[in-house]
């Protein structure tokens, strides 16, 4: 990884030190994404290393690197809020992520026309077919397809983008060293080596706490995925789907939110009409997407 970057208002910074400091902050009791965001909002000109003991930061950095090495990861990168190479779009999030890990080609995160394709893990046969048709059209029109590497719609979106010769980004809810679901191990490796995998999840916190608490990182990544893209397209989702967290985030962040027409025809759910009233765009044909993203 690159060991230095430039802080917008300060001298060059040590990325490994900042990574360790950030990880150390996350190991404090009761730390949450919201509390981390509030901490840096109240210290806008400070780096993670300004807020912790430096010996603790170095120790945490060593632990992360050792953990990654044990998982076969050597060439990873980070992006730190406040540096020139941090994605400006992520600052639109209600609680901007202070540090991101990534594997692969970061240039994809800056490519034009990034669109998230998301939906249920228990996708129907019709929903799977709609996902494939949608992604093929997006790739045909030179969009970069972003999704969360979950089962169902996400997996199909990534696979179809690759098969169609397009670009894809996975924004995952685990550290870059972990795979969830396990069935996607090969797909995650392929995206990491040929495209881009992004994670906001603190490595040591995830390693040291139980799955019950680690599940809370998944909805947070949906907010980041929305901020990183110019639009979110929902293929299929239930009334309680985590996809709706991303739907709300998209509207809050000033992003376009598209909902496929088939969702409005499903009498078992009411969320499509609710979000249409809030500003979401109903998609009856692919041109509805193109017209609104010109």
Which residues does each predicted region cover?
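Glycine-biased, small-residue-rich flexible motifs in mid-sequence functional cores and linkers
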Residues: 2-18, 76, 81-294
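Short, small/acidic-rich helices and loops at N termini and domain boundaries
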Residues: 1-84
């Amino acid at each position: 990884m690159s060991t230095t970057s430039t802080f917008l208002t300060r001298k060059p910074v040590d990325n490994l030190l900042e990574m360790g400091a950030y990880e150390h902050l996350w190991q404090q009791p009761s730390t949450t994404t919201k509390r981390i965001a509030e901490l840096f909002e109240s210290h806008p000109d400070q780096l993670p290393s300004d807020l912790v003991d430096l010996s603790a930061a170095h120790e945490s950095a060593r632990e992360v690197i050792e953990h990654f090495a044990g998982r076969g990861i050597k060439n990873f990168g980070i992006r730190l809020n406040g540096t020139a190479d941090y994605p400006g779009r992520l600052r639109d999030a209600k609680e901007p992520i202070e540090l991101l890990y990534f594997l692969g080609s970061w240039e994809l995160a800056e490519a034009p026309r990034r669109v998230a394709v998301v939906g249920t893990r228990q996708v129907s046969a019709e929903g799977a077919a709609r996902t494939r048709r949608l992604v093929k059209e997006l790739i045909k029109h030179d969009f970069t397809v972003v999704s969360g590497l979950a089962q169902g719609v996400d997996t199909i979106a990534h696979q179809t983008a690759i098969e169609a010769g397009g670009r894809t980004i996975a924004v995952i809810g685990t550290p870059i060293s972990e795979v969830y679901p396990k069935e996607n191990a090969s797909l995650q490796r392929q995206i990491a080596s040929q495209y881009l995998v992004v994670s906001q999840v603190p490595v040591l916190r995830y390693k040291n706490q139980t799955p019950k608490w680690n599940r809370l990182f998944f909805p947070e990544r949906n907010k980041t995925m929305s901020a990183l893209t110019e639009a979110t397209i929902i293929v299929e989702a239930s009334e309680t789907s985590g996809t709706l967290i991303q739907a709300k985030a998209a509207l809050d962040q000033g992003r376009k939110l598209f909902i496929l027409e088939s969702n409005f025809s499903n009498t078992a759910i009411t969320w499509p009409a609710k979000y249409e009233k809030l500003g979401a765009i109903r998609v009856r044909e692919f041109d509805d997407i193109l017209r609104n993203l010109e």
